[in-house]
Amino acid sequence: GRRNILELAHEAGMRQACYGVESGSPQVLKLIDKSGQTVEKMEIAIRETRRVMGYADCSFMIGSPGETADSVRETVELCQRVGLQPEGFFFTTAYPATAFWHLALERGLIRKAVTGVAGPANDDIMEQYFLRLGEQGDSVRTNFSDLPDEEIVRLSWEAISQLGAQNVFRHPHTGETQRRGVIRGATHADV
C-alpha cells in the first residue's frame, strides 16, 4: 500500500509539522480564501500529525474578515475535538504583498494602526506601520472583523483560557519554550 507521507518524513528526521489552520470556522476560512482547506481536512491532518510525531504545531488567527464570537467558538471546538492545546493565538495582521495587506490598505487599517483613525496610507504612514509591527500576538493592528479591537482581545484570552493554552511558544529546533508578552486587554493604541 501507499506509505503515509508523515511517517516517511518522520523516518527521514522531520520532527515538526506546522499548520496555519487560522480558524475552525468554515465561513472565516472561505472569506480568507484558504484555497480548499476545510475544517474536516485540518482535523485529519492534525490527528495524523499527532499520531506520527506526538505533536502538531498549529497557528490560529483572531480578527479575520467575518470573525465573530461564534467563529472563535468554532475554533475552540475544533481544538477540543482533536485534543489540541495550541501554543497561543495570533491577531490577524497585514503584511506587505499579501491579500490582507491590500485589504488593509483598501479599508484604511494601516493608517488606523498608526494614528487611530482609518484612512489612506502614504509612505510615512506605511513606514511607521512597519516599524511598529512587532509580533502578531502582542496587539491588534489590523482588525478585519466588525468587532471592536477590545472584543478581539477578550475573545483571544477567552479561547486561550478555555483551551488551557499558555501563550507559550516552542522553538521548532530546540524545543525550548518562551512565554509570549501579550498584555491582557492591550490594543493597538497601547503599543
Feature map (PLM): residue ranges:
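C-terminal non-catalytic accessory extensions
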Residues: 173-191
